[in-house]
Amino acid sequence: PVFVILQVVLAWRVYGYMSAVPVEIVTTWFSLIPVYSGTTSINLIGATLSTGIFAGIGIIYGHELSHCKGFAFLISRMTMALSGSAHFCYAHVYNHHLELGCEDDPATAPRGRTIYGHYALSYLGQSKFVYDMEKERLARMGKGFFSFDNRWIRGYLMSIPSVVLFFMAGGWIGVAALATVWIISNFELEALNYLEHYGLIRVKDQPIDYRHNWDNNTLFTSWFFIEIGRQADHHDRGETHFWELENVGAPNTGWGYFTMFALALVPPIWHWYMRKRLATWDTKFATAEAVSYTHLRAHETEADLVC
């Protein structure tokens, strides 16, 4: 409900901006906090950016619930739909958790790719996975692709109420505000995928192990991201609740998510920092097949540096 309310409040801000209500103090709270009528351009920009950031936090809870069944999974889909990414729930469970570290997993960033290139490639790759999965599933059931049984289509239909709300609040300005929220929140999601598995390689058909994750057990990361940094145990026991996840001694990048995110925003610094960590991983954790595979892919991933 909190994340639904956030969108409703932002839509109200858009409406206030578009209706040109005069900006003036109408009252104060506790004789300290002024309450204004109307919305300025700066107000709208700030409200949109902050809503996008908090919607990204909602995605963290959507991820947690995607590993549940029944009503909890539906809540996960609805939460992700607020960011235009309801497909994530199926892609995460049936693609990422099964194909971790392989080329078939769009959520795993290969070496050399930037966070910006990964954002688009991962989002589109996961959506395509669910598209293909549903196409095959419906064909086996003898049903057409354009069916209400298509969970890929239903996922995007779940986002329509948000689009309608913002269009009614402010026309295309409202839709632009919503699109900005989606861009920011999904960038946060893909940033987490980027930090959690960057450059780690699992040769296809090898078992998924602790070493195929960058763990993060820093205190603030654990509190703020509800233990999502304990990726190794999470991928080993996917249906385990976040408060039951343990530090299993998997490889780690040395800093909390906020610091690592700041480094990733500047690709040359990120690649410089991670080069040593990956070299250590190759020495201590990679199998002979993975090391050979790394060298074979080195030239392919160089092209991603321009992304």
Feature locations, PLM:
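Membrane-embedded catalytic scaffold of the fatty acid hydroxylase/desaturase
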Residues: 45-158, 206-278
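Transmembrane alpha-helix boundary signature
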Residues: 5-23, 61
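Core segments of transmembrane alpha-helices
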Residues: 2-6, 154-163
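Alpha-helical transmembrane segments of multipass membrane proteins
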Residues: 56, 163-165
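Conserved small/polar residues in nucleotide/adenosyl-binding loops
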Residues: 294-301
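Hydrophobic alpha-helical segments, chiefly the membrane-spanning helices
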Residues: 305-307
